[in-house]
Curated annotation (Swiss-Prot):
Coiled-coil region list: 32-69
Keywords: Cell cycle, Cell division, Cell shape, Coiled coil, Cytoplasm
GO annotation, biological process: cell division; regulation of cell shape
Tree of life domain: Bacteria
A GO cellular component annotation in the UniProt record: cytoplasm
Location of region: Disordered: 57-78
Subunit structure: Forms polymers through the coiled coil domains. Interacts with PBP1, MreC and EzrA.
UniProt name for this protein: Cell cycle protein GpsB
Subcellular location: Cytoplasm
Family, as annotated: Belongs to the GpsB family.
Keyword Cell cycle: yes
Length: 116
């Protein structure tokens, strides 16, 4: 892409030399050619930025539509994992309770018999 030659201040401050019949036609033409190039560059840049802006808006819209679906499936999957973990933990606690009753229950019964 072509680079921008003039700033607005450059255009404002441009002075043309006067010739016999006014300004030098060649100098004015060269300056205006450069101004036209700048405007074409600005126009192309604006067009490119508008296209990029439009593309990014579409991408954002698409992601916003996909986000609730993916979030819901992640929550459901996470809930399923949590439920499975809870069931596993509960099963372990039941087994531990039975084991404690078996081990400590005999000790409690033995101590009760000793007290009698």
């Amino acid at each position: 892409m072509a680079s921008i030659i003039f700033t607005p201040k450059d255009i404002f401050d441009q002075d043309f030399k006067t010739a016999v019949r006014g300004y030098s036609k060649q100098e004015v033409d060269e300056f205006l050619d450069d101004v036209i190039k700048d405007y074409e560059t600005y126009s192309a840049l604006v067009k490119e930025l508008r296209e990029e802006n439009s593309r990014l808006k579409q991408e954002l819209s698409k992601r916003m539509q996909e986000a609730p679906n993916s979030t819901a499936s992640q929550v459901h999957q996470s809930f399923g994992d949590t439920t499975q973990t809870t069931i596993t933990n509960f099963d372990i606690l039941k087994r531990l309770s039975r084991l404690e009753k078996e081990v400590f229950g005999k000790q409690i019964q033995a101590s009760e018999l000793n007290q009698l």
